[in-house]
Amino acid sequence: MTTKGILGKKVGMTQVFTEAGELIPVTVIDTTPNVVLQLKTVENDGYSSVQLGFDDKRQVLSNKPEQGHVAKANTNPKRFIHEIRNVELGDVKVGDTIAADIFEAGEIVDVTGTTKGHGFQGVIKKDGQRRGPMAHGSRYHRRPGSLGAVINRVFPGKKLPGRMGNKTVTIQHLEIVKADTENNVLLVKGNVPGAKKSYLVVKSTVKNTK
């Protein structure tokens, strides 16, 4: 199955009316034209993909390897670089640009982003566990519960206090409401992971759309 995708930046959320008068929430994604930085093929790399670059970085903020990587594409160093796998390469070559017009209204996509970070949190906020009795005699309010008396170790993945958020998350099966080619903007129905100005990857959905 071939895939198409583009990199973007989350602008925020708004709402639009459909022709039937239905009000739907949408996320605005800035998809300033991406630059093709590298092409990978099955013969050379073992898989096929297109490496895209998004959001220019000033030369003074980039090092020599970053400048050399984009030299063949004749563009500025990029802040966000990502590969889209299983792409039908066709006539695509290094230095080409990919814009929002690769998608159309009604298409179904998967959006990947980095969730908001919330720092070190307890199990009530982080995992939704219940608190203990709040009476005066109780000494157990918001702490984690007992880990048990038999097993002498903690299993990996046990829900305990720790860092919350700042993880890569993919929201699947979102509908594109509008692809604004003039302003290089995609309107996606619903919400997507991450804070405003965070980077996103928009790809064709991997699941059956029936």
UniProtKB/Swiss-Prot annotation:
It comes from the Bacteria. One of its GO terms (biological process) is translation. One of its GO terms (cellular component) is cytosolic large ribosomal subunit. Keywords: Ribonucleoprotein, Ribosomal protein, RNA-binding, rRNA-binding. GO terms for molecular function: rRNA binding; structural constituent of ribosome. The keyword Aminoacyl-tRNA synthetase does not apply. Belongs to the universal ribosomal protein uL3 family. Part of the 50S ribosomal subunit. Forms a cluster with proteins L14 and L19. One of the primary rRNA binding proteins, it binds directly near the 3'-end of the 23S rRNA, where it nucleates assembly of the 50S subunit. This is Large ribosomal subunit protein uL3. It comes from Pediococcus pentosaceus (strain ATCC 25745 / CCUG 21536 / LMG 10740 / 183-1w). The gene is rplC.
